[in-house]
């Protein structure tokens, strides 16, 4: 709070009669000074003695009215004191206490209120720290000026963010319409064939649009509310700073706390691009393959991995539905001699019937999967297989393998009895592959589940002399292969 020196000075320049700062001070012979209006005959009658000679209201020393003289030194001190505590050109206005009718001259620090001397002695304020309003006015004036500066900077930042969000909102809406038109144009060509698929795609886009707009609008609404609250707070502070001392200090604790701790909450990341762009399929073919995929998925079996067939290079998940390559633990030419590779078989054995399972190969740069004869199992190192062209024969049907695979991140191959292996063309790289075994028909088919179930390759018209097992080889890629339930 204000220095005790100001308190002492104020006491020296306070009129003993009206208890206010001296106004046009007059001094008498004893040295005491009073306001001109308080000590002259036209002032307060209670201080006027008898005609002619009068006595000092403080020490009762007699004096002649004609001996009253202006005290310019005190007048200058009072003027300077007012400038220190209130600012140049400002005057205290007398405001009366609503409860006691006395002048509001004190400020209660604990309650942040302006009170009178009777309030100070009441039970409500007993024991509280009180100060003269002149002492605290300048301090709060400076504090509010700092708060105003900070809050106006926040207001400018809020205005910039508002413009930014509106721009993003417009940009987001502009992205929606051309994409919507493109989807509708593609599907209108075959409206009667695949109307259901079109509506599904439009619904997905609409949901993404609504989600994006909701995020943007929530950020915009939050910013509007923050801006409104900020402006109300700024208006309150400006009103207090421009008003009287009473208006400045009344209920000051609340506004002080709000202004000091107010901080603009900035929005989180706003959507800028579609997560995925629509690819128009060959609708006639898509309808056919979708029906085919739906048919084979009805033969789904819950395949699990057999840990007893897993190589030391591999780690299986506890549920035995995921396998991951962790690096070779055997080096040198002994790999081939010990028939060492990185494959694992399924626990299920198939000697009849139709069976289907799906494998997630997303983000893998190399993999091999399909079926193999149960009497074979792992036979050689994949690293050697990738480097030695003649090793392809080890994965051919004549060797008991009906498999396809990925090499070098983009080469998809079917390992037929021909040499070299058959290079496959993929318009959409498969993140999930479906495997369908029809034992009696002698076929093993592979489906690109990622691309609506389009066929990848089919080994057909084979005679399976032995029981078959699902075959999985994550190769030397650390990304796992995972067995999935259809549509999961």
Curated annotation (Swiss-Prot):
Entry's Gene Ontology BP terms:
antiviral innate immune response; cellular response to interferon-beta; cellular response to virus; free ubiquitin chain polymerization; innate immune response; negative regulation of DNA-templated transcription; negative regulation of gene expression; negative regulation of stem cell differentiation
ZnF B box-type: positions: 92-133
Assigned EC number: 2.3.2.27
Localization terms from the record: Cytoplasm
The EC class name is transferase
Which residues does the annotation say bind Zn(2+)? 97, 100, 119, 125
Gene3D superfamilies documented for this protein: 2.60.120.920, Classic Zinc Finger, Zinc/RING finger domain, C3HC4 (zinc finger)
Gene Ontology CC: cytoplasm; cytosol; nucleus
Q: Which residues form a coiled coil?
A: 134-248
Q: Which Pfam families match?
A: SPRY, zf-B_box, zf-RING_UBOX
Reaction(s) this enzyme catalyzes, per UniProt: S-ubiquitinyl-[E2 ubiquitin-conjugating enzyme]-L-cysteine + [acceptor protein]-L-lysine = [E2 ubiquitin-conjugating enzyme]-L-cysteine + N(6)-ubiquitinyl-[acceptor protein]-L-lysine
Zinc finger RING-type: from-to: 15-60
Instruction: Indicate the secretion signal residues.
Output: none
B30.2/SPRY domain: residues covered: 282-488
Its UniProt pathway annotation is: Protein modification; protein ubiquitination
* MF annotations from Gene Ontology: DNA-binding transcription factor binding; identical protein binding; protein kinase binding; protein tyrosine kinase binding; protein-macromolecule adaptor activity; ubiquitin protein ligase activity; zinc ion binding
Q: Which keywords accompany this UniProt record?
A: Coiled coil, Cytoplasm, Host-virus interaction, Metal-binding, Transferase, Ubl conjugation pathway, Zinc, Zinc-finger
Record family assignment: Belongs to the TRIM/RBCC family.
Subunit note: Homotrimer. Forms heteromultimers (via B30.2/SPRY domain) with TRIM5. Interacts with MYC. Interacts (via SPRY domain) with IKBKE. Interacts with VAMP8; this interaction contributes to the activation of the type I interferon antiviral response. Interacts with DHX16.
This chain's function reads: E3 ubiquitin ligase that plays a crucial role in the activation of the IKBKE-dependent branch of the type I interferon signaling pathway. In concert with the ubiquitin-conjugating E2 enzyme UBE2K, synthesizes unanchored 'Lys-48'-linked polyubiquitin chains that promote the oligomerization and autophosphorylation of IKBKE leading to stimulation of an antiviral response. Also ubiquitinates MYC and inhibits its transcription activation activity, maintaining the pluripotency of embryonic stem cells. (Microbial infection) Ubiquitinates ebolavirus protein VP35 leading to enhanced viral transcriptase activity.
Q: What is known of its domains?
A: The B-box zinc finger and the linker region between the coiled coil and B30.2/SPRY domains contribute to higher order self-association.
Protein name as annotated: Tripartite motif-containing protein 6
Source organism per entry reads Homo sapiens (Human)
Q: Taxonomic classification, please?
A: Eukaryota, Metazoa, Chordata, Craniata, Vertebrata
Gene name, per UniProt, is TRIM6
């Amino acid at each position: 709070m204000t220095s005790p020196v100001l308190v002492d000075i104020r006491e020296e320049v306070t009129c003993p009669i009206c208890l206010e700062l001296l106004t046009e001070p007059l001094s008498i012979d004893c040295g005491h000074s009073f306001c001109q209006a308080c000590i002259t005959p036209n002032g307060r009658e209670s201080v006027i003695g008898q005609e002619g000679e009068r006595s000092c209201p403080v020490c009762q020393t007699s004096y002649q009215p004609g001996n009253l003289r202006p005290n310019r030194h005190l007048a200058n001190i009072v003027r300077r004191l007012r400038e220190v505590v209130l600012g140049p050109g400002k005057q205290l206005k007398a405001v009366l206490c609503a409860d006691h009718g006395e002048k509001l001259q004190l400020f209660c620090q604990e309650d942040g209120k302006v009170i009178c001397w009777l309030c100070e002695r009441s039970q409500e304020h007993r024991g509280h720290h009180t100060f003269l309003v002149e002492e605290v006015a300048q301090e709060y004036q400076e504090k509010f000026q700092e708060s105003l500066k900070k809050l106006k900077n926040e207001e400018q930042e809020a205005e910039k963010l508002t413009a930014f969000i509106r721009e993003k909102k417009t940009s987001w809406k502009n992205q929606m319409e051309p994409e919507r038109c493109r989807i509708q144009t593609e599907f209108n060509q075959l409206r009667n064939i695949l109307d259901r698929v079109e509506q599904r795609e439009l619904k997905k886009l609409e949901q993404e649009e609504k989600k994006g707009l909701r995020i943007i609008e929530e950020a915009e609404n939050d910013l509007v509310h923050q801006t409104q609250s900020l402006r109300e707070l700024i208006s309150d502070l400006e009103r207090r700073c421009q008003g009287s001392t009473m208006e400045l200090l009344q209920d000051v604790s609340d506004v002080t706390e709000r202004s000091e701790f107010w901080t603009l909450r900035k929005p989180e990341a706003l959507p800028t691009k579609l997560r995925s762009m629509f690819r128009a399929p060959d609708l006639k073919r898509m309808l056919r393959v979708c029906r085919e995929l739906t048919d084979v998925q009805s033969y789904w079996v819950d395949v699990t991995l057999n840990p007893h067939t897993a190589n030391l290079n591999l780690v299986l998940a506890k549920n035995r539905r995921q396998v991951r390559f962790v690096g070779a633990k055997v080096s040198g030419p002994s790999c081939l001699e010990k028939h060492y590779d990185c494959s694992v078989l399924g626990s299920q054995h198939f000697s009849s019937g139709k069976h289907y399972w799906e494998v997630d190969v997303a983000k893998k740069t190399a993999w091999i999967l399909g079926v193999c004869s149960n009497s074979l199992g792992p036979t050689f190192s994949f690293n050697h297989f990738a480097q030695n062209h003649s090793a392809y024969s080890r994965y051919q049907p004549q060797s008991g393998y009906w498999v396809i695979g990925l090499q070098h991140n983009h080469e998809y191959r079917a390992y037929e009895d021909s040499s070299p292996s058959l290079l496959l063309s993929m318009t959409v790289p498969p993140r999930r592959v479906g495997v369908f075994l029809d034992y009696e028909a002698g076929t093993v088919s592979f489906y690109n589940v990622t691309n609506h179930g389009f066929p990848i390759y089919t080994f057909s018209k084979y005679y399976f002399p032995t029981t078959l097992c699902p075959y999985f080889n994550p190769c030397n890629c650390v990304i796992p292969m995972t067995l999935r339930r259809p549509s999961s």
